[in-house]
Amino acid sequence: MLPATFKLCAGISYRHMRNMTGLRKNAMIAIHHELNKLSGPGASTWINHIRRRSSLLSSPIAEETYSEADQCYVQQGQEALQKSISILEDQDGWQTEIESINGEKVMSKVLPGIGKVFKLEVTLEQQTGDLYDELVDNMEQMGEWNPNVKQVKILQKIGQETMITHEISAETPGNVVGPRDFVNVRHAKRRGSTCFLAGMSTQHPGMPEQKGFVRAENGPTCIVMRPSADDPNKTKFTWLLSLDLKGWIPKTVINRVLSQTQVDFVNHLRDRMASGGGIDAAIAC
């Protein structure tokens, strides 16, 4: 029997977790169903690009042996991607929160069962592959360039696409929102020229709640990166963010903090890429 900790990881039955191939197949069928909905009239061009060039289902399913707990994490990551795609394909109901002179646009909407979610859209000067390498391969270095993050630590890797992370956020100016920590399952995919980094909160035996931090909840979240239609050397960057910061914080404060956090993140990412920090670190290793 799975420990209670892992039963909380995903709302799936023990019998379903016994077969990894079936589990991944069912999750991918669900993703394929979402992509099918996006292929009709008015579908966004980037989803059509994914389907045309290299769909999420195009690669063969590797025969990998995972523990039951690891299977649970893999399914959670795939579920985060599936839910995020479903949210992003629905263009109705988004309200503008921020529109900056640098091109960042943050929008929000309220979803049943999830709450308020935020979507940032911007075009970045860097190539998609370079951004993916920085955000995925150099994930643990994020605290070096993003002052809103104190630490990112990879607790466990499962195959090539799934990992469990522990992240500590910094307090906001004036300590309006104190330090939070998160335990997330992350699911990273590169399909054709489009890259995904999806995630959601989970539990891990190696990281119980920590003294001095409020354990916040995250997800579904997803960063989608693809070459710009106007210039393939630039990247169309879309970030879906859903957070429950916990604690007694007014909603107006939460909304302001989260939308501004997205804009700040993009600006810090620009600075990081311009400095070549991630590339320099890779060469030094």
Curated annotation (Swiss-Prot):
Highly expressed in the testis and at lower levels in the ovary, kidney and head. GO terms for cellular component: mitochondrion. SMART domains: START. It catalyses: cholesterol(in) = cholesterol(out). SUPFAM superfamilies: Bet v1-like. Residues 65-278 form the START domain. Pathway: Steroid metabolism; cholesterol metabolism. Pfam families: START (PF01852). GO terms for biological process: cholesterol metabolic process; intracellular cholesterol transport; oocyte maturation; regulation of steroid biosynthetic process; steroid biosynthetic process. Residues 1-61 form a transit peptide. Gene3D superfamilies: 3.30.530.20. GO terms for molecular function: cholesterol binding; cholesterol transfer activity. This is Steroidogenic acute regulatory protein, mitochondrial. It comes from Danio rerio (Zebrafish). The gene is star.
